[in-house]
A protein has these predicted regions:
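Glycine/proline-centered hinge or cleavage motifs at structural transition points of membrane proteins
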Residues: 106, 175-176, 189
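Cytoplasmic-entry segments and transmembrane alpha-helices of multi-pass inner-membrane transporters
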Residues: 2, 75-114
Length: 280
């Protein structure tokens, strides 16, 4: 039986290696031809003129990921705390399946919800303040991604909080701490590794999300810090143009995938380092 387990593990490793080989073998030549600095810091993406700069899409990906974290992390963490320590059993029986259902909803359905509900709401509210915007924007994508990462953060954080020995809570209460104080000063810090894991997983999903973002972000590759302006992320750029790209254009899109892969790798390595430091 151990041979079967070994083969399964080897298959997983082989899949990762093959993906890395494909990305770097096809992406690095494009970076060399375009110029790494020009590729990473170029402000214009015009395949028709052989101009390939992905800085706008890098920044746009960071903007909507940061926005999703600002929206999703507080809500997700507080919901996890409520479900672990405050929620009545009957309400928990309803709330838990709902959060699990959120995780199973396809991205395209989230995108449709954002396009029909979130985008018009932003357009309407902006109009009240005299702003003429389409609604497809950084803000719309951030709100939608904030909702999409909730089940990941809630599920992992709740499991981490429930894994903390009850003796921690009982000891804090015995020393005179109130219920809220025992939770936020004892239980939550004890579960910080698991909570951080949930946040990192949520960030990973946000930065790599494609279909939902395409439907609400506006898909305009440009440099902007305006939350009400349309943007294009790295994954969206790959999906929108890969179908007809050839030659250097295709290789530049694969190189964009390399940059996205490195982003995810940095996030995971950062989490690993932080986890080791906290365990030391």
């Amino acid at each position: 039986m151990h041979v079967v387990f070994f083969v399964c593990a080897l298959t997983s490793i082989a899949a990762v290696v093959l993906i890395c080989l494909f990305l770097f073998a096809n992406g690095i030549p494009a970076m060399k031809e375009i110029g790494l600095l020009n590729f990473l810091t170029g402000a214009k993406w015009k395949p028709g003129n052989d101009i390939y700069g992905i800085l706008p899409m890098i920044l746009d990906s960071i903007y909507i990921t940061a926005g999703a974290v600002v929206i999703g992390v507080p809500i997700g963490l507080l919901t996890a705390i409520f479900m672990a320590f405050y929620c009545p059993k009957k309400l928990y029986g309803l709330l838990k399946p709902c959060t699990e259902l959120l995780a199973g909803i396809p991205s395209i359905v989230y995108g449709f919800f954002g396009m029909v509900i979130i985008v018009p709401c932003i357009r309407t509210v902006a109009a009240l303040f005299g702003a003429d915007v389409s609604g497809s924007s950084i803000l719309a994508a951030s709100i939608l991604l904030g909702i999409m990462i909730l089940p990941t953060i809630i599920g992992v954080s709740e499991a981490a909080l429930r894994a903390v020995p009850s003796a921690y809570y009982e000891g804090a209460v015995a020393m005179g701490a109130r219920h809220e104080r025992a939770i936020f000063t004892v239980m939550l810090p004890a579960a910080k590794s698991g909570v951080l894991a949930g946040i990192v997983l949520g960030i990973g999903r946000a930065i790599g999300e494609t279909m939902a973002v395409i439907m609400v972000a506006g898909n305009q590759p440009r440099l902007t810090g305006n939350m009400l302006k349309g943007i294009r992320t790295m994954p969206a750029n790959i999906v929108l143009e890969m179908g007809y790209a050839t030659g250097l254009h295709r290789e530049a899109l694969i190189a964009t995938g390399v940059v996205l892969f490195v982003f995810i790798l940095i996030i995971n390595l950062t989490f690993s380092v932080l986890k080791r430091r906290k365990q030391a």
